[in-house]
Amino acid sequence: MEKYLIVGLGNPGSNYAKTRHNAGFMVINEICNKLNLFLDNSKFNGMFAKTIYNNCVVFFCQPTTYMNLSGEFVSKMLKFYDIPIKNLIVIYDDVDTKLGVIKLRKKGSSGGQNGIKNIINLLKTEEIKRIRVGIGKDPHAKLDQYVLSNFKIDELVIIKPAIIKGALAALEAIGEDFDKVMNKFN
């Protein structure tokens, strides 16, 4: 059976749970709610749920390191469970994408996002499938303060459908041609 590692990026702790930077965690939580899974397994500074989905063994994960160290968890999980990089999908927030929009890519640079940057550096490849959740940006705020701020109430109405759509895209990508999934969701 093929194995997949689906990783949502964010920062651990309840004080970060509703921040923009935790959009990746929010997508993983949405998937787990949809599939009635619990992130109750712990390994390599991360939490994960393991299940069979679309005839594949799938690990839905949230690193418990801070965002900029996410690659340590990802590289150890890939190696330990013998998961090929082609079956890695990383989900994270993107300030360069409009609030509420998701974008799927098969490869590319980090775009300045420190979590995916660390993963790219440790895996030594930019050929990593990803789902970027648009959080937009505030031209009047410092970037670090903005990404670590909670979504405003009126923004939650916009981001929630994107979280659901990101979860559906991740699930559809398991065992399927990623180009086909990109065409559907982009």
UniProtKB/Swiss-Prot annotation:
Highest rank taxon of the organism: Bacteria
Keywords in alphabetical order: Cytoplasm, Hydrolase, RNA-binding, tRNA-binding
Disulfide bonds: none
Pfam families, alphabetized: Pept_tRNA_hydro
Residues the record marks as site: Discriminates between blocked and unblocked aminoacyl-tRNA: 11
Gene Ontology cellular component annotations, sorted alphabetically: cytoplasm
Top EC class, one word: hydrolase
Endpoints of the signal sequence: none
An annotated Gene Ontology molecular function: peptidyl-tRNA hydrolase activity
Recorded catalytic activity of this chain's protein: an N-acyl-L-alpha-aminoacyl-tRNA + H2O = an N-acyl-L-amino acid + a tRNA + H(+)
Subcellular location: Cytoplasm
Major site of localization recorded for this protein: cytoplasm
Record-annotated active site: 21
Entry EC no(s): 3.1.1.29
Marked site (Stabilizes the basic form of H active site to accept a proton) residue numbers: 93
CDD domains for the chain: PTH
Residues holding tRNA: 16, 66, 68, 114
Record-level GO BP terms: protein quality control for misfolded or incompletely synthesized proteins; rescue of stalled ribosome
Subunit structure: Monomer.
Task performed by this protein: Hydrolyzes ribosome-free peptidyl-tRNAs (with 1 or more amino acids incorporated), which drop off the ribosome during protein synthesis, or as a result of ribosome stalling. Catalyzes the release of premature peptidyl moieties from peptidyl-tRNA molecules trapped in stalled 50S ribosomal subunits, and thus maintains levels of free tRNAs and 50S ribosomes.
Protein family per UniProt: Belongs to the PTH family.
Name by which UniProt lists this protein: Peptidyl-tRNA hydrolase
